[in-house]
Amino acid sequence: MIAAASPAAVISIIIDDLGYSSSLGKKAIQLPNAVTLSVLPDSPHALTLSQQAIKHGHELMLHLPMQSVSNPDRHEAGTLALDTLESDFKITIQRFLENFPAATGVNNHMGSLLTQHPGHMAWLMQTLAEHKGLYFVDSRTTDKTIAATIAGEYAIPHTSRNVFLDNKPRDEAHVRLQLKRLLRLARQQGHALAIGHPHPATIKVLKQMLPRLAAQGYEIVPVSRYIQIQEKMSPHFSPQRSQTLSMVH
C-alpha cells in the first residue's frame, strides 16, 4: 500500500531507448501521455515512433548516445565520444535536432565516460543553446557526471534522474519497488524523476500503477513541466545533491 501524498508531490517518468523495437515502442506509446518518451535518433524506428508518440500527446526527447566507461570502444551509430572532433560533435547533434524538430529536450544514453568531461559537455550545451527552449536531463549513469552543472552554466533548463526503474528489466517486483522509491522521494522533496525502458515488465507495472497515483495525491507531468515546477519548489536546486540510484553505463 502506497501512502497518499500531498498535492505538491510531482513525478516525471521518462521511457528512453525507443527506436530499436517497433512493437515495444508502440507499447510505450500506449502509456499515459504525461509519460515522456525519448528516442535514440539513429535507430531504425525512431522517426515512425516519434511521430506516433506526438500523435498520442507525449512529450518527445532525444536520447543522445554517448561513450561509456564500461564499454568505451562500443560505438553505436551517432555516438558522441572523447575522440569526436568539436565540429563533428556539434554537427551530429544539429542533425539529430533537425531530424526531430518536435523534440523538447535531450538526455544521455550511456555516457558514463563522456559526461565526466566538461569540454564535451560544453559543446553539447552550446549546441542546445542555439535552439531556444530545449532542456537537458542528466541520466546520471555515473556519480562523477558534471553534465547538469555545465547545463546550468549555459542557462540550459535542466534536471537529473533520481531513480532507475528497471535495472532488473525482467523483474516486475523490482520495478514496483523502484516506483515506490520514486514516490517516497517525491513525498520527501516535493518532486522526483525516474527513467525506465520499454521492457515488458516496466510497461506492465506502469500501466497498473500510474492510473492510481492521482487518487493518492501524486501529479505526473512531462519533463518540461517538471523542470518548471522543480525550479519553483527548489530555487537553489543542485543536481549534484539529488538523490540517485546510479548505474554505470
Give the ranges of each region predicted by the language model:
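Terminal interaction modules at protein C-ends
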Residues: M1-A9, R176-K180, G217-I220, S224-I227
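Active-site beta->alpha N-cap acidic-glycine motif
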Residues: S6-P72
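Hydrophobic faces of well-ordered beta-strands that scaffold small-molecule active sites
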Residues: I11-I15, V35-L37, H58-L64, V106-N108, ...
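Catalytic beta/alpha-barrel core
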Residues: L18, L37-D42, N107-H117, A129-D143
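Glycine-enriched alpha-helix->loop->beta-strand junction motifs that scaffold or abut catalytic
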Residues: L31-A34, G57-H58, T127-L134, G152-T159
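Alpha-helical scaffold elements lining the catalytic groove of polysaccharide deacetylases
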Residues: H75-E98, T115-H120, T149-R187
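Active-site groove signature of glycoside hydrolases
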Residues: Q94-L114, I195
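C-terminal domain-boundary segment and adjacent tail
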Residues: L128-D138, T142, P198-H249
